[in-house]
Amino acid sequence: LMAAEVIHGGVGAAGALSAQTPQKDVAKIRDGIIYTGMAYEISERCDSISARLFRGINYLQSLRSHARDLGYSEAEIEDYINDDAEKDRLEAIAREQLRLLGVVEGEEATYCAAGRAQIAANTRVGWLLR
């Protein structure tokens, strides 16, 4: 899943109500990373759909800012970004979500159909695509 680089390439993570909460347990951050990865994967696998790059970058930066607002240091954010086990976990979740949307790995038409449906429903994934 090529989304890993986007998922972790510029996004921090954050604690829920305090910096004591594991960063992976903060829904806004975790889900935002997953949605971004799903959108990226669709845009990479479907030639007729592209990622809204500036929107995506701004969204990822807003997640990083949220992490800082919750009290995480840049070092803590970077540690989370570089956590390979967490990256693998989030990729698996993103792949499963795509599968539930009807995506079949290697079948471009299924990525396109899922992407168009997400755009039409104006989901967070769809909001990141055009």
What are these regions (language model features)?
Residues 2, 29, 40, 105-106, ...:
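Generic detection of intrinsically disordered/low-complexity segments and helix-coil linkers/edges
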